[in-house]
Amino acid sequence: MTEAKNPRSLVGTVVSNLMDKSIVVNVERRIQHPLYKKYIRRSKKFHAHDAENICHIGDIVKIEECRPLSKTKSWRLVSVLAEGVIEGDNA
């Protein structure tokens, strides 16, 4: 068995971290409408493995494709690029 040579990687925003060692990442992309040529935002949610539970809601993260870890998880957390701001925290 060999590892994937170039696994796909995506950058997105953490929208849920309620599960143990799992996060949900929302990835946005822009596509051009085939007829009207207007750019439209499309988004998709990916379940990713967060082994150390370090992510918080609002964080910008990089995820990478891996072998299936569960029924819905086949991505893993690579790094946290930027930490999200917690609203209502005026300390």
UniProtKB/Swiss-Prot annotation:
PROSITE patterns assigned: RIBOSOMAL_S17
Keywords: Ribonucleoprotein, Ribosomal protein, RNA-binding, rRNA-binding
Highest taxon, organism lineage: Bacteria
InterPro entries assigned: NA-bd_OB-fold, Ribosomal_uS17, Ribosomal_uS17_bact/chlr, Ribosomal_uS17_CS
SUPFAM superfamilies, per database record: Nucleic acid-binding proteins (SSF50249)
Gene3D superfamilies: Nucleic acid-binding proteins (2.40.50.140)
Disulfide pairings: none
Pfam families with a match to the protein in the record: Ribosomal_S17
Biological process, per Gene Ontology: translation
Cellular component GO terms, alphabetical: cytosolic small ribosomal subunit
One GO molecular-function entry: structural constituent of ribosome
Assembly with partners or alone: Part of the 30S ribosomal subunit.
Physiological role: One of the primary rRNA binding proteins, it binds specifically to the 5'-end of 16S ribosomal RNA.
PANTHER family: 40S RIBOSOMAL PROTEIN S11 FAMILY MEMBER, SMALL RIBOSOMAL SUBUNIT PROTEIN US17M
Name of the protein in question: Small ribosomal subunit protein uS17
Source species of the chain: Acidithiobacillus ferrooxidans (strain ATCC 23270 / DSM 14882 / CIP 104768 / NCIMB 8455)
